[in-house]
């Protein structure tokens, strides 16, 4: 009996559903017929439905990207769009026929690029900083557009950081620190720093990763890879794509603060063990027991940022001493420890007086490091010692081993050594628009021929090249008070055991070169002794 009632109930439900569907179908047919009777064509109805469907899907994707994906898709689309417009603009308008409009072309491209980078934020800010530090190698419009790239990036509100603190500590942040300022003291591309005090009373800097960085990283690197491929293979034919995997790997390691803590600790130990660095360089201590992947706690270090030249002058800081300390530290890392800080831009360097009243350089942000092989370290050290002694043969030998097809370009741009026959002129030479275009075209051809064999280029050089250009730019900003090659060659020589014997003509020219240096550049080319002298 129970089975019969179940069967009857099932039949009733099925019949009811069938009747409802039939009514719905009939209504749809009736409404469709009514639309046809009112003169709405079938094709138009189809396109209306498609439009509604696509619009709804677009709104849904945008909402998902905004709420759950940290605008990563929107930023990627914005980047691809801007890069495509820039590529098309240069492809169509960078020509001899339009030489009189080249300056305007560079200006609008630089403005487009700056707006996109600043709006996207995150890792894009680092790209903007690279462009800013390369202003002397780029058209003037880029230098003007990117001159404010080292200012503080927009900071994230305190409430948005709470999930990261809970993920790190498993408890409210107020239980970890005696006090912590809710407004960031500094904000950079991927993180911001808050002042805090430990229960012990020690003042610390709490570096916390911005919440969106983890979600945006994969998207940003995917777009970077795509754009490098397109620019390399289809548009500019400049060898760029081979760098993608290595650069992406380095950037991924930078957002892991445990890696940064290890780098910082290693650098600190190296400085403390080296006589000529111990009192001149300072690396803040890391509190590893309360640091993790997305939060890092270090001791608070006061100082004047390297970019604030007015404050440095008012404090009586020596420009030469500041930069000598910086060059010695980086040379020590390049030619001895083999772990090199590759982000020495002015915002990551503070200057203060040590206990003896001497200038002391504080090095911050040890996330972006490169790790050298022993073979590369020896070749790199040889390059600098050869550069100082004007051993052109050894310089060319190293560059040939690295597959570099334009040694003059490499020496001029990265080492700041003039190897070509072109002599510097005094004053500003007035040239025509057509001549300016020809110069830019020649520079582009040089760069294309720069990498003769990408398979032989040491990957370390990709990041070290950035490091060298950054510190050369710092030197330029201060008016070149230090001969960086002389300072770094002295350190390289200290850690080079297999030194080649000088040739007869090097011995012959050495006294002449010495007289030339001291007559025209008194004190600037002298190899400084690696001591803790208190000059």
Curated annotation (Swiss-Prot):
- What Pfam family is a match, any one? ABC1
Task: Give GO MF terms, alphabetically.
Answer: kinase activity
What's one GO-annotated cellular component?
A: mitochondrion
InterPro entries documented for this protein: ABC1_dom, ADCK1_dom, Kinase-like_dom_sf, Mito_struct-func_regulator
Which residue ranges does UniProt annotate as crossing the membrane?
Answer: none
Describe the family membership recorded for this protein in Swiss-Prot or TrEMBL.
Belongs to the protein kinase superfamily. ADCK protein kinase family.
Q: Spell out the protein name for this chain.
A: ABC1 family protein C10F6.14c
Originating species: Schizosaccharomyces pombe (strain 972 / ATCC 24843) (Fission yeast)
Higher taxonomy: Eukaryota, Fungi, Dikarya, Ascomycota, Taphrinomycotina
